[in-house]
Amino acid sequence: MAADQGTFTTSVTLSPVEGSRTGGILPRRAFRRSCDRCHAQKIKCTGNKEVTARAPCQRCQQAGLRCVYSERCPKRKLRPSRAADLVSADPDPCLHMSSPPVPSQSLPLDVSESHSSNTSRQFLDPPDSYDWSWTSIGTDEAIDTDCWGLSQCDGGFSCQLEPTLPDLPSPFESTVEKAPLPPVSSDIARAASAQRELFDDLSAVSQELEAILLAVTVEWPKQEIWTRASPHSPTAFPERITQRRHNMWANWLTDLHVFSLDPIGMFFNASRRLLTVLRQQAHADCHQGTLDECLRTKNLFTAVHCYILNVRILTSISELLLSQIRRTQNSHMNPWEGSRSESPSRDDTSSTSGHSSVDTIPDFSEDLPIGELFSYVDPLTHALFSACTTLHVGVQLLRENEITLGVHSAQGIAASISMSGGPGEDIARTGATNSARCEEQPTTPAARVLFMFLSDEGASQEVKSAGSRGRTIAALRRCYEDIFSLARKHKYGMLRDLNNIPP
């Protein structure tokens, strides 16, 4: 019996246990305390309460499974000579890392209870004559080493057999992502490309208008935005009138700053480009499809945004013009009017002082062109007429943009502004009367959006009670009316003076 059993280093003999992989005899304490199923799930095994008697655990019995105990993995290396023998005995060193499952029915039950736990925890070196070779494994008991991760083993004896789950395909992976996109009709692709090009053009105009609005509302009030005319000092004026009238003329030109607004051309050009893009959008091919409708909606809101930017820019410019003209008008007098107010008649002035109103005119620059003569001689009239021209052109561009967007000519902002005064007042009133009779409603999507923008115009007669949009439109109407009213008064006075000039 002693020849068939393994010998412990502490001279304690255990009962033989049949190996699960071989028919040979293995030391009793070479097996785990837990069965393979409990060990894999890392839970406490209830079947091996006694050291030597390995009965099936309760979990395996309840599940109706076979309770198997495998060999422990050595915690220290064998002697080099014995390790070399084990490696050379089998070409696959990973199979020696742990013993195969042992049937619970083959475990001996006659081992005494006197074996201590300290002795069972020691690793036992079997004698050199012990045969570790295992018989060939049957086909039904073969283990897939790739599935259990044994193919990654490096042959070391510190490796422990741990069941690992195989790499399963992700449930989120689908072949739909790799499937080719459905073919798109050439008409749909052409219409979508045209709408995208229109959006790019509208975006470029929108960015330019936003930059102009920022300059008008933030930068222009902080710096000199008008071109100053350098008054030339008169040299032939008499001492008693020269100094006062020369100072008056210099202040005129310095404070009024002859009207020359450089960015106004940029603003008008941007408005014309917007009108061109809107006309292209109106004549673009329309395709009945979801994509085409979405692209058209995006272009619609971008176009309305550009139109609102035009309204706000024109409002800010008109406020700057009116404030500058009023400040200059209240501070100084026109040199021509000043000369006439000082003397009751031209003959009396010439007889008493020996000078006429021509003496109030400053010296002219030798390179002064004819086109700048009027602004040099009468800067107030020139500024008023320039402001009227600016507002007139701006309102015309607004009206054309409204018509292109589908707004009736008598229902837009341009019509409400023109009714307050200025050129084309009678035509605008006639159109407004006809529109009130017809009571036409907005027909295009853009017109409906602009109608929402103009919805509070009915309450914008009083600026304080109107909303932000109503305040903007009311301010534009007020500046338009005041500037044209000042221009008409000044024009009538100038014509009256011209008619009173003797030949």
Swiss-Prot record:
Compositional bias (Basic and acidic residues): 339-349
UniProt keyword annotation of Transcription regulation present: yes
GO molecular function terms listed in the Swiss-Prot or TrEMBL record: DNA binding; DNA-binding transcription factor activity, RNA polymerase II-specific; zinc ion binding
GO BP terms, alphabetized: positive regulation of metabolic process
Comp. bias regions, Polar residues: 1-14, 350-359
Entry GO terms, CC: nucleus
Induction summary: Highly expressed during the first day of culture on solid medium; thereafter levels decrease but remain high. Expressed at much lower levels in liquid culture.
Family matches, as InterPro entries: Carb_Metab_Trans_Reg, Zn2-C6_fun-type_DNA-bd_sf, Zn2Cys6_DnaBD
Name listed for the protein in its UniProt record: Transcriptional regulator LovE
